[in-house]
Amino acid sequence: MNRVLYPGTFDPITKGHGDLVERASRLFDHVIIAVAASPKKNPLFPLEQRVELAREVTKHLPNVEVVGFSTLLAHFAKEQNANVFLRGLRAVSDFEYEFQLANMNRQLAPDVESLFLTPSERYSFISSTLVREIAALGGDITKFVHPAVADALTLRFKK
């Protein structure tokens, strides 16, 4: 069975992330969205809420599971019996960092392959950072995120 691990901070999960998950769900037997705690990134949403939002966005996909983690990714992949890391590449600028990450992961988890997918062109410009900035300034984010995520962002920035 092919089990793919799609790691990220997902702060918040966007339609670009959702596009990759949908496509991965057709390619793999089981997709695990691995939501990283990432405390050094000082996320807008706590881990539990990011996990819940990812579950809401992907609830229509029966072979997709969402799990939070705060350990080394290579160790988490072994715990989950994953044999593939899935990473998204929006632009050439993403490649250098992702290439380094893939090589490091190969050293730490040699049995887990790294696979890169590019998002659909209509989502290639979306990033969680941009979505947060637009939401913080009161802009319309409904084209970039699932309605539950838009609601969570609106509520978060009303405070």
UniProtKB/Swiss-Prot annotation:
Q: Which family does it belong to?
A: Belongs to the bacterial CoaD family.
Cite the annotated pathway: Cofactor biosynthesis; coenzyme A biosynthesis; CoA from (R)-pantothenate: step 4/5
- Per UniProt, ATP binds at 9-10, 17, 88-90, 98, 123-129
The encoding gene is: coaD
Query: Which cofactors does this gene product need?
Result: Mg(2+)
What quaternary structure, including any partners, is listed in this protein's UniProt entry? Homohexamer.
Query: Could you tell me the Gene Ontology terms of the biological process aspect for this record?
Result: coenzyme A biosynthetic process
- According to its UniProt record, which reaction does this protein catalyse? (R)-4'-phosphopantetheine + ATP + H(+) = 3'-dephospho-CoA + diphosphate
Record's Pfam families?
CTP_transf_like (PF01467)
Top enzyme class? transferase
Chain sites annotated for binding substrate: 9, 41, 73, 87
Q: Where in the cell is it found?
A: Cytoplasm
Catalytic activity, EC? 2.7.7.3
Give the site residues for Transition state stabilizer. 17
Ordered alphabetically, the record's keywords are: ATP-binding, Coenzyme A biosynthesis, Cytoplasm, Magnesium, Nucleotide-binding, Nucleotidyltransferase, Transferase
Predominant location category: cytoplasm
Organism name: Pseudomonas fluorescens (strain SBW25)
Q: What is this protein called?
A: Phosphopantetheine adenylyltransferase
Give the protein's function: Reversibly transfers an adenylyl group from ATP to 4'-phosphopantetheine, yielding dephospho-CoA (dPCoA) and pyrophosphate.
Which top-level group of life is the source organism from? Answer: Bacteria
Its Gene Ontology cellular component terms are: cytoplasm
Output the Gene3D superfamilies linked to this UniProt entry.
HUPs (3.40.50.620)
InterPro entries to which the protein is assigned, alphabetical:
Cyt_trans-like, PPAT, Rossmann-like_a/b/a_fold
GO MF, one example? pantetheine-phosphate adenylyltransferase activity
Q: Which CDD domains match?
A: PPAT (cd02163)
Q: Does the keyword Nucleotide-binding apply?
A: yes
Q: Which NCBIfam families match?
A: coaD_prev_kdtB (TIGR01510), cyt_tran_rel (TIGR00125)
